[in-house]
From Swiss-Prot:
CDD domains: Macro_OAADPr_deacetylase. This is Macro domain-containing protein in gbd 3'region. SMART domains: A1pp (SM00506). PROSITE patterns: MACRO. Residues 1-173 form the Macro domain. It comes from the Bacteria. NCBIfam families: PRK00431.1-6 (NF001664). Pfam families: Macro. InterPro entries: Macro_dom, Macro_dom-like.
Length: 173
């Protein structure tokens, strides 16, 4: 996939009309603050029930991994819940865990024959991952994963805040 298939928008990921939106989830999968809470709130109880079923069968989702559920009431029919790392100074494998969250989301989308995805800025909110570093990792990891998933036609980075939007726009222009 070439660079023109990556784009950035400033907005609300819960309104994206794509095949799947990615949720910056916590390992318990039961919703939280920020984008996680917004997605659970907008998608309704079907998302929470699907997450609870995953939690009951596999005990949640480890950091760097991803699981897929229904999109509930969202415009996107699926939600991929990716668990990014909490920033702990950068010497606890955070870079690779963040890259894996993006890579595993792409792999899961490809396995489910999805073509258009939207990502939030994973780990840059309450998890405090440095935004510039996270943007570099996210773009590189997505490009790497897309090389092995040619069926994916479009990836949109949906930035809720001005700083992330500026960082992604600079890197993708």
């Amino acid at each position: 996939m070439s660079g023109e298939h990556l784009q950035v928008v400033h907005g609300d990921i819960t309104r994206m009309e794509v095949d799947a939106i990615v949720n910056a989830a916590n390992s318990g999968l039961l919703g939280g603050g920020g984008v996680d809470g917004a997605i659970h709130g907008a998608g309704g109880s079907a998302i929470k029930e699907a997450c609870r079923a995953i939690r009951d069968t596999q005990g949640g989702c480890p950091t760097g991994e991803a699981v897929i559920t229904t999109g509930g009431h969202l415009p996107a029919p699926y939600v991929i819940h990716a668990v990014g790392p909490v920033w702990q100074g950068g010497d606890q494998g955070e870079d690779e865990l963040l890259a894996n969250a993006y890579r595993n989301s792409i792999r899961l989308a490809a396995q489910h024959h999805l073509r258009r995805l939207a990502f939030p800025n994973i780990s840059t909110g309450i998890y405090a991952f440095p935004r510039e570093r996270a943007a570099d990792i996210a773009i590189a990891a997505v490009r790497e994963a897309l090389a092995a998933a040619p069926e994916i036609e479009q990836v949109t980075f949906v930035c809720f805040d001005d700083e992330n939007y500026r960082l992604y726009r600079e890197r993708l222009s």
